[in-house]
Amino acid sequence: MATEDDGELSARYQNTLDALSSLITKRGRLASNNQSHRFRLLFHYLKVLELEDAVSQMKIIHVAGTKGKGSTCTFAESILRCYGLRTGLFTSPHLIDVRERFRLNGIEISQEKFVNYFWCCFHKLKEKTSNEVPMPTYFCFLALLAFKIFTTEQVDVVILEVGLGGRFDATNVIQKPVVCGISSLGYDHMEILGYTLAEIAAEKAGIFKSGVPAFTVAQPDEAMRVLNEKASKLEVNLQVVEPLDSSQRLGLQGEHQYLNAGLAVALCSTFLKEIGIEDKNGLDQTNGLPEKFISGLSNAYLMGRAMIVPDSELPEEIVYYLDGAHSPESMEACAIWFSKQIKQNQERNQKRSEQILLFNCMSVRDPSLLLPRLRSKCIDQGVDFKRAVFVPNVSVYNQVGSSTNVGTRVESMSWQFGLQRIWESLARGEAKSNSKSDSKGKEEEKSFVFSSLPVAVDWLRDNARQSKQVRFQVLVTGSLHLVGDLLRFIKK
């Protein structure tokens, strides 16, 4: 029966996720020779999976960067789909379900296909493991799985987002992409990539391939110098692209998306010329973008970035503004987007509103860099948070399951109390400054730590029910995991 089939598939899928979870290892900054060894193993894995020839023939757009690489890939995939190409998109991380990482023609892969492709790869690799050749780690396996899916499904173009860094990233096993892109660079994953922009840029530039054209956006001088040096050594024609004109409608919100869209346009223009679909004149932007580019840009969609979602129980009283920003620069972009949305809403809506921050970040981040950038940029734009809420993420990091329990899993709250202290310190500093210039000061801010996301959402809903005349506008940021947890919890 259909229900029994669905139940059987659901059970198989959960078993698959459990097996995938077994590949998760703790990540840290490995010695260079260890990273190099793990990277070389990827070529062995491709051979075991009999994917060497198929991968070498794939037409690939490869994108690295600190910020905006996922958005750039999303724009590029949407544009190329408008040209009738069968697309394969591999991105990370996922928010709710691991299948989000694998998209065929813009649609995440089905459970049935995912299960079948997974076990095909898993069993073949498991048969060949030894002390010298262990099973691939979690992300390496996902990249190999992407290659298996996209080659078997015979896509016309693969858009690959680098997972971390570039030089030793699992996606960099490809030898001859059609074109490469580097989105905005900044400080992130420094414990792995290095503590200077020069070191980080060198890792990202590791995706450059001899003679393969590459594009980037305007970068800090230190980073740009390294990118140019790496490109010159490999005879790569590296070009810097400008943001798209802000009159162009984009499917992804935020002013920073015009920069990502500009990079995507350059990548797609080059790709289409290289495979002979469009000639150079057909993509001359001086006469405006081709209609298919305009359509692709305006219809692009990426979950968890600049996303507005009403609460499932109290849609009129609580609205969530979701953005997975987790670097200092992306915090500023998030603040600008959020502030703009608040102002536009105030112009349209007579109901009084209150802005609330719901925040967490991973312990590898530095909240003393993130929270001040977010707060000061919002204040610059005329938006103040009346309350701030700090919670742990729900997701279990050694478990992939899309059915991750969203109950009240209690952990040590020391990290969240630390976030609260940083926030309150910022508030006290502003209060002192305001008291000197304004005798009235401003309404006292409040901050809270809750043991879990469900408890925090219940608290928000209780407050909203008691204050029907006020609309709560909740910015959820600091971690894509937190954004995914909230989406899962409110069942959106």
From Swiss-Prot:
The modification N-acetylalanine is found at A2. Mg(2+) 1 binds at S92, E161. Its main location: cytoplasm. It comes from the Eukaryota. The keyword Transit peptide does not apply. Disruption phenotype: Vegetative phenotype does not differ visually from wild-type. No obvious defects in root development. Polyglutamylated folates still detectable. Has significantly reduced methionine levels compared to wild-type. Combined loss of FPGS3 and FPGS2 results in seedling lethality. Seedlings fail to proceed beyond the expanded cotyledon stage, exhibit an albino phenotype and are unable to thrive beyond germination. Fpgs3 and fpgs1 double mutant exhibits dwarfed leaves, late flowering (approximately 13 days after wild-type), reduced fecundity and delayed senescence. It is found in: Cytoplasm. The keyword tRNA-binding does not apply. GO terms for cellular component: cytoplasm. Its EC number is 6.3.2.17. Keywords: Acetylation, ATP-binding, Cytoplasm, Ligase, Magnesium, Metal-binding, Nucleotide-binding, One-carbon metabolism. It is an enzyme of class 6 (ligase). This is Folylpolyglutamate synthase. It comes from Arabidopsis thaliana.
